[in-house]
Regions:
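Short linear capping/connector segments at secondary-structure termini
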Residues: 87, 120-129
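Amphipathic, non-transmembrane alpha-helical scaffold segments
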Residues: 20, 28, 70, 74, ...
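Amphipathic alpha-helical packing segments from all-alpha helical-bundle domains
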Residues: 79-82, 127-156, 161-166
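C-terminal peripheral helix-coil segments that are non-catalytic and often amphipathic
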Residues: 1-14, 108, 140-156
Length: 167
């Protein structure tokens, strides 16, 4: 697996995102915008549907409930952030340096992300349960991403061989 596709592969193993469904994308975009603006608690599915320019029933046909929408929005944001990190890493030649830089970039981007900043300032009590209980897929996503990144660097001889299975 090339470095360019690690994030996409990790995401696809954890959640099925319909490709080319413009309405689905509009719902995700509206959800993200409203979650950043008003927080998770204050945003309703009706708010999201209105912002997306669709009916509430259409939103519910694509997402069973707000929790599912939250999960998909966050997973999509993770995938997009990791894709940007992978793009930045293309400029780094040394494999070990690439692994270290990936961690630095991930932490930096996380601290600057508007949704994470919103949750930390207005709903900190929801963040830990969200990440550990409701977004268990995200842990799998990061595990697959990290294992893929390390495997590529092992294959390139940049870091020593270790089995990735424990990850």
């Amino acid at each position: 697996m090339s470095r360019k596709h690690i994030a996409s592969e990790a995401l696809l193993k954890n959640i099925q995102v319909p490709q080319g469904d413009k309405t689905y994308e509009k719902i995700l975009d509206a959800g993200l915008a409203l979650f950043v603006e008003f927080g998770l608690r204050r945003t309703t599915m009706e708010d999201v549907a209105t912002r997306a320019g669709i009916g509430r029933a259409t939103a519910y046909r694509r997402f069973a409930d707000k929790d599912q929408l939250i999960q998909v929005v966050i997973l999509r944001e993770c995938q997009q952030q990791l894709a940007m990190i992978e793009s930045d890493l293309e400029k780094v030649d040394d494999g070990l340096e690439r692994v270290l830089e990936s961690f630095v970039l991930a932490v930096t981007r996380a601290h600057r992300h508007p949704l994470l900043k919103r949750l930390l300032t207005s709903e900190p009590e929801t963040l830990l349960p969200l990440l550990t209980q409701r977004l268990w897929q995200m842990m799998g996503f990061f595990r697959i991403y990290l294992a893929g990144l390390l495997q590529v660097e092992q294959d390139n001889g940049a870091i020593r061989q270790q089995p990735m299975e424990p990850m």
